[in-house]
Regions:
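Ligand-site clamp/hinge motif
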Residues: 152-195
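Gly/Pro-rich hinge or "lid" segments in bacterial periplasmic/extracellular proteins
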Residues: 105-163, 173-174
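Aromatic- and charge-enriched surface segment that lines or borders ligand/interaction sites
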Residues: 33-76
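Ligand-binding "clamshell"
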Residues: 83, 195-209
């Protein structure tokens, strides 16, 4: 589940992170109860909240977090940056983990926002099992749609919706056509402007994701003061 950037929007429906980030980039506990850093800043102890279950009813434990960290290290495409400073992590009992870092990191909790997956989940698993507010249900053979149901045991309260269906398309044009015709109620992941379509409401919101634009100041293009 950590390999594909295109699935990121679904992660937040099926999975939870140990911490969440606010608009001011401060970390708030989610699956984690607390994180206590060591004096050297290169180690720390994490406690997991009690009473949290996966959508299949199995309890969340420290082994699940340990498995997730190691899985991301092996498949770093999307969340590799969150774990690259982790030298080692060990589980102690059902609710405690010890982290050793390569370098001191003052706000290490802000890195612990990746989705936690169930330990020993087969990579070939068709439908994800997470602690999030929704659980994946039936999908068609061609993986063009996925039916999702509410997770009645969600640790932060019952979801507002009972369920919904996700439809996957391979072009922006198909996605916008489905939305404009009323077949789909929500659209994301496309650059096509559909704001002019009938009965469409456009909502804009801030995110805490960064985009980086770098300039080679030593290059010939920037050798002039006017540049």
């Amino acid at each position: 589940v950590t390999e594909y950037e295109s699935c990121r929007q679904l992660y937040y429906l099926f999975y939870d992170g140990l911490f969440t980030l606010s608009d001011s980039f401060s970390a708030a506990p989610n699956l984690a109860e607390s994180y206590t850093p060591g004096e050297d800043g290169k180690s720390g102890t994490l406690k997991i909240k009690h009473g949290i279950n996966f959508s299949d009813g199995s309890p969340l434990t420290a082994d699940d977090v340990l498995y997730t960290v190691n899985f991301i290290k092996e498949h770093p495409a999307t969340y590799g940056g969150c774990v690259e400073n982790i030298e080692s992590v060990t589980a102690s009992g059902a609710d405690t983990l010890y982290f050793i870092l390569y370098e001191p990191e003052r706000h290490f909790e802000t890195m612990l926002t990746f989705p936690v997956i169930k330990a020993n989940s087969p990579e070939s698993m068709a439908y994800p099992v997470g602690t999030g507010q929704f659980a994946a249900g039936a999908g068609d053979v061609g993986y063009t749609s996925l039916t999702c149901r509410k997770n009645s045991g969600y640790h932060m309260g019952r979801p507002y919706l009972d369920g919904f269906t996700v439809r996957f398309t391979n072009t922006d044009l198909k996605a916008s056509a489905s939305f404009s015709s009323g077949e789909s109620d929500l659209l994301f992941g496309t650059d096509i402007d559909v704001s002019s379509a009938e009965k469409v409401k456009v909502y804009e919101g801030r995110t805490n994701r960064f985009e980086f634009l770098g300039f080679n100041a030593a290059g010939a293009l920037f050798s002039e003061d006017s540049a």
